[in-house]
């Protein structure tokens, strides 16, 4: 077996049971990985030098095909209502078949790190069948120094073989696609999908399981730091503005997607970004756009024209087009991947019902309530003439990646908020003056002005009113922001329609939260929205 590249000889790929391979490439850099990718016909080059790969039928994650091994260790610690179990025997069989399937193949190994905090990191080895997957994950995770690679010992191993097709009957799975996670042995097997995001989220899932036991809060969020060292954390589901609002030229970007919060403050789990590129433009998002125009970036499912120019407006392969690049491709990114204790937490929502105010201040109990709710609203497809928005509740703002019960994360968050006296804000980037189809999108200028006032501390001195539906505190006046926008009811022409819409949304919150009622105390239960009669 031919082995190339810097690695710890005492911790070679054979320690994972992989044998009789034709070649193993360890820790290759971008140029070598480009060569191998092109040689194998796995991807194309854009005119600017980015590597452009297509993932075939899977253009997103496959949450229904993800399984967690249910054993003596995980039995009482995993939230089985939300995680599909796999028996240890089925996993063992799958693992043996992966090893058999890999025989005679060339494999690529990247020895990487998840977690910028030395006390809370995991050494994650990622073994891939595709060369472009090796570059992708190298861009996304933290890269050890050349010296460190010589003594690197993996604590977690991910084996990604897209050509492996799972037999549902043999392993008790759903389809030919499988993502099997053994949290006890820290092994992840990915088969039957070429979507690269599965690898990144597997490391996130492992850290989300390991860290709470150490009192460290894992978060699906972006984070940045102001010139005075004040750290801000942005929670939010897809499409709420997490990446856009945390990319602020006046602040240092710590990371855009996954972080931990421990005794030393906030730290990035990753060393790169995985940004959406559909309708990306140099005008709207210059820093992200610039990363797509250079060597080293991986473009996923982006359409190229005949001159190899990327067309970011073309969603014919998927709306979920992406780019993966190292964090240092962003000019104002943090070099350490670390920030201090957060001063502000922002929970983003895009309320398409037009009910929520553009900003509200939350108590620690309200913050836990809204964190467990994880609300946003998707806008229905207009092609069928459906204008009714759809409420989405994804607990902890990232349910698919949270192996433990949400209340564990919620209680940890509440404890840290109280301990460090963090200001918490709910920011609505959705609709104002009516629901989607009637009202208009919240002006980004207003959102940025409100956010700036929250982050610089001046918003704490504003006069607040209590929202009659949600019970949180809403500023009455903020310099540079039209006052009417701060009171959503006043922006609706039809006040009766507003009250009906508010009641509808409150009822959705209440019924969604029923499953958490037995896991929270009275203070959090009392933070639930309730209809209080609004004055005309």
From Swiss-Prot:
The keyword Magnesium does not apply. Its EC number is 4.1.1.49. Binds 1 Mn(2+) ion per subunit. GO terms for biological process: gluconeogenesis. PROSITE patterns: PEPCK_ATP (PS00532). Coiled coil: none annotated. One of its GO terms (cellular component) is cytosol. ATP binds at residues 201, 220, 236-244, 285, 322, 447. It comes from the Bacteria. Its cofactor is Mn(2+). Pathway: Carbohydrate biosynthesis; gluconeogenesis. It catalyses: oxaloacetate + ATP = phosphoenolpyruvate + ADP + CO2. Keywords: ATP-binding, Cytoplasm, Decarboxylase, Gluconeogenesis, Lyase, Manganese, Metal-binding, Nucleotide-binding. Pfam families: PEPCK_ATP. Mn(2+) binds at residues 201, 220, 257. GO terms for molecular function: ATP binding; metal ion binding; phosphoenolpyruvate carboxykinase (ATP) activity. Substrate binds at residues 61, 195, 201, 322. InterPro entries: PEP_carboxykinase_ATP, PEP_carboxykinase_C, PEP_carboxykinase_N, PEPCK_ATP_CS. It is found in: Cytoplasm. Its main location: cytoplasm. Involved in the gluconeogenesis. Catalyzes the conversion of oxaloacetate (OAA) to phosphoenolpyruvate (PEP) through direct phosphoryl transfer between the nucleoside triphosphate and OAA. HAMAP family: PEPCK_ATP. Belongs to the phosphoenolpyruvate carboxykinase (ATP) family. PANTHER family: PHOSPHOENOLPYRUVATE CARBOXYKINASE (ATP) (PTHR30031:SF0), PHOSPHOENOLPYRUVATE CARBOXYKINASE ATP (PTHR30031). This is Phosphoenolpyruvate carboxykinase (ATP).
């Amino acid at each position: 077996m031919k082995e190339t590249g810097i690695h710890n000889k005492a911790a070679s790929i054979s320690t994972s049971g992989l044998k009789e391979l034709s070649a193993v490439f360890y820790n290759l850099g971008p140029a070598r990985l480009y060569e191998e990718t092109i040689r194998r016909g796995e991807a194309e080059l854009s005119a600017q030098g980015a590597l452009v790969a297509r993932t075939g039928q899977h253009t997103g994650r496959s949450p229904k095909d993800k399984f967690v091994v249910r054993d003596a260790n995980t039995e009482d610690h995993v939230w089985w209502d939300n995680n599909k179990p796999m028996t240890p025997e089925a996993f063992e069989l799958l693992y043996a078949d992966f090893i058999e399937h890999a025989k005679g193949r060339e494999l690529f190994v990247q020895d990487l790190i998840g977690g910028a905090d030395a006390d809370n990191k995991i050494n994650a080895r990622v073994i891939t069948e595709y060369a472009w997957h090796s570059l992708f994950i190298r861009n996304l995770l933290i890269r050890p120094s050349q010296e460190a690679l010589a003594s690197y010992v993996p604590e977690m191993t991910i084996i990604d073989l897209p050509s492996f097709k799972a037999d549902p009957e043999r392993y008790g799975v759903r389809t030919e696609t499988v993502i099997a996670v053994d949290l006890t042995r820290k092994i992840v097997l990915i088969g039957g999908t070429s979507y690269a995001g599965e690898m990144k989220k597997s490391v996130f899932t492992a850290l989300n399981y390991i860290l709470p036991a150490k009192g460290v809060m894992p978060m699906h969020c972006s984070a940045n730091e102001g010139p005075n060292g004040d750290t801000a954390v942005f929670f939010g589901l897809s499409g709420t503005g997490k990446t856009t609002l945390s990319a602020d030229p006046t602040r240092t970007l710590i990371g855009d997607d996954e972080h931990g919060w421990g005794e030393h403050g906030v730290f990035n789990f990753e060393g790169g970004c995985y940004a959406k590129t559909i309708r990306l433009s140099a005008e709207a998002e210059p820093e992200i756009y610039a990363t797509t125009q250079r060597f080293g970036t991986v473009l996923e499912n982006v359409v190229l024209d005949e001159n190899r120019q990327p067309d970011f407006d073309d969603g014919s392969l998927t709306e979920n087009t992406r780019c993966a690049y190292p964090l240092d491709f962003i000019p104002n990114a943090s070099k350490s991947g670390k920030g201090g204790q957060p001063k502000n937490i922002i929970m983003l929502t895009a309320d398409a019902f037009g009910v929520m105010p553009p900003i509200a201040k939350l108590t620690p109990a309200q913050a836990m309530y809204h964190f467990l709710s994880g609300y946003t609203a998707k806008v229905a497809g207009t092609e069928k003439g459906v204008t009714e928005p759809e409420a989405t509740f994804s607990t902890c703002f990232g349910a698919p990646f949270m192996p433990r019960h949400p209340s564990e994360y919620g209680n940890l968050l509440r404890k840290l908020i109280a301990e460090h006296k963090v200001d918490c804000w709910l920011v609505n980037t959705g609709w104002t003056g009516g629901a989607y189809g009637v009202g208009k999108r919240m002006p980004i200028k207003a959102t940025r002005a409100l956010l700036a006032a929250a982050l610089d501390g001046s918003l704490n001195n504003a006069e607040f009113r209590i929202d009659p539906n949600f019970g949180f505190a809403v500023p009455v006046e903020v310099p540079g922001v039209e006052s009417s926008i701060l009171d959503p009811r006043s922006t609706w022409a039809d006040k009766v329609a507003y009250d009906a819409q508010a009641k509808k949304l409150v009822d959705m919150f209440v019924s969604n939260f029923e499953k958490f009622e037995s896991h929270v105390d009275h203070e959090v239960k009392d933070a639930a929205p309730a209809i209080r009669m609004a004055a005309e």
